[in-house]
Design a protein with these regions (language model features):
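A short beta-loop-alpha structural element at the N-terminal edge
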Residues: 2-17
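Hydrophobic adenine-recognition pocket in adenosine-nucleotide-binding enzymes
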Residues: 7, 90-92, 125
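Short alpha-helical
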Residues: 10, 14, 66, 129-130
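Acetyl-CoA-dependent GNAT
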Residues: 23-25, 34-84, 89-93, 146
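Conserved acetyl-CoA-binding loop-helix of GNAT-fold acetyltransferases
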Residues: 89, 98-111, 115, 136-137
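Short glycine/proline-centered loop/turn elements that form peptide/ligand docking sites
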Residues: 102, 106, 128-131, 148-153
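Conserved GNAT acetyl-CoA-binding A-motif
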Residues: 113-126
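Conserved acetyl-CoA-binding loop of GNAT-fold acetyltransferases
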Residues: 136-146
Length: 156
């Protein structure tokens, strides 16, 4: 059974795992070392998470184990649109992918952000990433193409 809930403060360190898992690796490409998440352009997603009022995170718990997370914060990241729009990141451990858990996480986060009054949410995704379709189904629209990536926004 899958339970979607807010992350607990003592669990925030798990976002490092999900940040690494969120890195899209095309078929046949060697995964980068885990130390890649220490790079400044990636640390913006997790450093000090929970300290700002616009930091929100939901986790998916399957049989008592955290299987995935979706989180947003207003940050100057790849998905940055403006200083009022939170950027979204989502990731699951590989063994939980393809079961609809990511869709549940995404939809519940969007519902929560609507209730909190956010007018829109943004994200950046590589064009080859299988999650692109999930974002489109959730209402995200491409607002800018950036080489291999697209900047997407969903208006609430």
């Amino acid at each position: 059974m899958t339970v979607i809930r807010e992350i607990r403060s003592e669990e925030i360190s798990v976002l490092d795992d999900f940040l690494y898992e969120a890195i899209f690796i095309p078929k046949g490409v060697e995964p980068p070392p885990r130390s890649i998440i220490e790079q400044e352009d990636l640390q913006v997603y997790v450093r000090g998470f929970g300290e700002e009022p616009h930091d929100h995170c939901l986790v998916a718990e399957v049989d008592g184990k955290i299987a995935g997370a979706v989180w947003v914060r207003i940050m100057n990241d790849y998905g940055h649109v403006d200083d009022q729009t939170p950027s979204l990141a989502i990731s699951l451990y590989p063994e939980y992918r393809g079961q609809g858990i990511g869709t549940q996480l995404l939809n519940q986060m969007l519902d929560m952000l609507r209730r909190k009054g956010y007018p829109q949410v943004s994200l950046s995704v590589q064009k080859e990433n299988y999650a692109l379709r999930m974002y489109q189904k959730a209402g995200f629209e491409t607002v800018e193409e950036r080489g291999e990536e697209v900047l997407m926004v969903v208006r609430m």
